[in-house]
């Protein structure tokens, strides 16, 4: 197959003309019609026709041949391209392009500052803030396909690299300097944006993001935000409003410990379980409510705290319940222990009655399927020795 631009699809620069986006759409359509596998992947991941109706970010479980044979028109390709940039539709992308091409546009000023934030360009950011100090309170006006459609992120939210459009979720090595530049200039440290169906400050978004963790700056950013007054306790009632419980839920133990060091309270059995504090967990056990105990087992298994898992099982917690909402509720404690590579915890759960045939509710994988997909060879061998099968094997 000859070279096709879609195979090298990448986001266009900020001030790209609408014609360039149209060209991307035409290339996508042409590549789909020629059977290009990259084009099929883009359509599968971004066109609503090929996404799950209940879990709108999840591609349907369908063969590539079905997408290849689908009758698609230019409007379909344009919609998919708009969704690659996380816009709601082509009209929203077109409105954005019009905004960034007006020299006096607040959209251009804000989006240019976003580019400086995610690129780690301190000089450009300072220049933008000096010329337009209102940027410190400005909000994104993008119309996305998220819940809710307009996330209203501030520039500081972009430092967290979470809850905003995917191609802007980047963490430069000097993210701490970027954050300090914004905060020293007067950015509101706990401003709320509309993300994931709730209202969130930067801190909980930071401690649930893989990008600052992979860049090695997540803990330093926690300290920076707290230095400037960020609340370490929950603000509001959204699912992930507690920075500590959010960090634990997403597996960022170092960030969780940093929050405790900076004053976050360990005042629930779930928090104690996630942090591996056996004495505290045992002390809280008798007075903990059922949901807290349920959450505690989920977190203890996810983080590999064997003694706390045993404590909770001895107290009657059921290893076969799906985890509670906000703690990978599509999976069981065994799924999470397997995925994180906690072999001893997985073995204990199996010994205490954890079923091997329960499928997660998103990917329909059994614990063995998770082990094999995640490269947990020793755990997979153990599970197979105890009769485990993958979903495909169970359906044979």
Can you say where each PLM-predicted feature lies in the sequence?
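Ankyrin repeat boundary signal
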Residues: 137-139, 191-193, 234-236, 268, ...
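Conserved ankyrin/ankyrin-like repeat signature
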Residues: 124, 178, 221, 254-255, ...
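N-terminal segments that cap or nucleate solenoid repeat domains
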Residues: 105-151, 155, 275-296, 308
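Ankyrin repeat A-helix N-terminal signature
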Residues: 115-120, 149-150, 158-175, 202-218, ...
């Amino acid at each position: 197959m000859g070279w096709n631009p879609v195979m090298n699809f990448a986001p266009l620069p900020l001030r790209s003309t609408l014609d360039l986006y149209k060209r991307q759409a035409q290339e996508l359509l042409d590549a789909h019609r020629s059977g290009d596998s990259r084009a099929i992947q883009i359509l599968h991941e971004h066109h609503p026709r090929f996404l799950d109706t209940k879990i709108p970010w999840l591609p349907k479980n369908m063969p590539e041949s079905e997408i290849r044979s689908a009758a698609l028109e230019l409007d379909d390709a344009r919609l998919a391209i708009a969704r690659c940039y996380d816009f709601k539709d082509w009209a929203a992308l077109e409105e954005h392009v019009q905004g960034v091409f007006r020299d006096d546009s607040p959209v251009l000023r804000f989006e240019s500052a976003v580019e400086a934030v995610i690129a780690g360009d301190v000089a450009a950011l300072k220049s933008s803030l000096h010329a337009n100090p209102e940027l410190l309170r400005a909000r994104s006006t993008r119309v996305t396909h998220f819940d809710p459609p307009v996330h209203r992120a501030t520039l500081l939210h972009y430092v967290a690299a979470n809850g905003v459009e995917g191609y802007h979720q980047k963490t430069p090595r000097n993210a701490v300097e970027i954050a300090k530049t914004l905060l020293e200039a007067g950015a509101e440290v706990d401003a709320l944006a509309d993300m994931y169906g709730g209202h969130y400050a930067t801190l909980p978004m930071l401690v649930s993001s893989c990008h600052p963790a992979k860049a090695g700056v997540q803990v330093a950013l926690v300290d920076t935000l707290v230095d400037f007054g960020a609340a370490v306790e929950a603000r509001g009632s959204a699912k992930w409003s507690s920075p500590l419980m959010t960090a634990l839920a997403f597996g960022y133990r170092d960030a969780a410990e940093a929050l405790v060091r900076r004053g976050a309270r360990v005042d629930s059995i779930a928090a104690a379980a996630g942090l591996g504090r056996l004495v505290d967990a045992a002390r809280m056990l008798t007075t903990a409510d059922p949901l807290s105990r349920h959450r505690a087992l989920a977190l203890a298994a996810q983080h590999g705290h064997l003694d706390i898992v045993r404590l909770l099982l001895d107290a009657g917690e059921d290893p076969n319940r799906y985890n509670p909402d906000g703690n990978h509720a599509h999976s069981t404690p065994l799924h999470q222990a397997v995925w994180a590579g906690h072999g001893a915890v997985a073995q204990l759960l199996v010994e205490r009655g954890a079923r091997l045939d329960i499928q997660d509710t998103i990917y329909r994988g059994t614990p063995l399927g998770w082990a094999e997909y995640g490269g947990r060879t020793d755990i997979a061998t153990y599970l197979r020795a105890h009769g485990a099968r993958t979903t495909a094997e169970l359906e044979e």
